[in-house]
Amino acid sequence: MQKEINKDSSDPGTFIQGRENKVFITGGTGFVGSYIIRNLVEKGHSVRAIRRSNKLPFYISSEVLNRVEWVNGDVLDIVSLNDAMQGMDAVVHSAAIVSFSRKERHEMYHVNVEGTANVVNAAIENKIKRFLHISSVAALGRTIKTETVTEQKKWEENKNNTHYAISKHHSELHVWRGFAEGLEGVIINPSTVLGFGDWHQSSCAIFKNAYKEFSWYTKGINGFVGVEDVAEATVQLLFSHMTQRRYIINAENRSFQQLFNTIADGFHKKYPHREATKTMGEIAWRMERLKEIFTGKKALLTKETAKVAHSKTSFDNAALLKELPNFQFNPLEKVIKTACEKYLQALNSGILSL
């Protein structure tokens, strides 16, 4: 069910752009979560964020981070969640583990599914007015044939779904349950998120591979979006009146080869020039699996990453642009150029290492 909540603007429960709101965020030290925090702080909102360690993202200014009320806790600890959410108006649930490694699978399900259930339950307990869940296009499921995915796509169990996708699908079920129990809010499904961050983690590793002139490419197709666009869409939807809806957040669809070439241009590096076929991928992930078994080192390529690299899926962003008519995505060329410049600056200053 999808609906719009109509509220009188004088209602104190109504969110108004420009008015300070108290927003609680999970995953605030992560790539996407930290940019959401920056967006909220710069718009004048009061932010409280839960974290497991004192380490903060180096790619967000200390001026922004110092304006956040940091609370030690964990999404797997319902007591700390309940305490941290007291007095807040809204919740952005961004905490999640993104992994395609067999070794991290159990923890990923634990955090992504049970953690989301805890956040939803705490939000209901604390009578949170608005709830926004950061999901992923992966939660919509991979397609067997080349096609464009919209918000109407129904989840289907098939061999193309990764365990990460399954965990995000099950986490969404807890959010829909929360909506049925009275929470108001939306789910967003970003595609692969690009930007300046820690290139030893998450999708930022794509930039490190390009900088190191990784020579292989595949002919897979996927959706991509800048991290600042994800943050802006998050904040606009958080303070909208839409509820019980999902929105795909995707700027452009392009091949992995095109993406790698654009990033290589940003670093003035060589293009990848060797095609990794499906057969080669099948052999490579098996060799990596054996190496992982015998050495204990995390596999650089898994069965799931090999599968994703060759899939051809595009994502439709029409629903978001209809809902937010003044919203505009930054072109990927601009996103990548800006990110590459910042990565080079971080390397030269010693903030970032290879």
Where are the model-predicted features located?
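N-terminal Rossmann-fold cofactor-binding loop
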Residues: 50-54, 75
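N-terminal Rossmann NAD(P)H-binding glycine-rich loop of SDR-like oxidoreductase domains
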Residues: 22-43
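Mid/C-terminal beta-alpha module of Rossmann-like enzyme folds, strongest
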Residues: 233-300, 322, 331-332, 337-354
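NAD(P)-dependent short-chain dehydrogenase/reductase
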Residues: 182-224
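Substrate-positioning beta->alpha
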Residues: 118, 170, 201-202, 218-239, ...
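Active-site Tyr-X1-5-Lys
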Residues: 160-186
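Conserved Rossmann-fold NAD(P)-dependent oxidoreductase catalytic core, especially the SDR/UDP-sugar
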Residues: 114-163
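NAD(P)H-binding glycine-rich loop region in Rossmannoid oxidoreductase-like domains
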Residues: 64, 68-114, 122
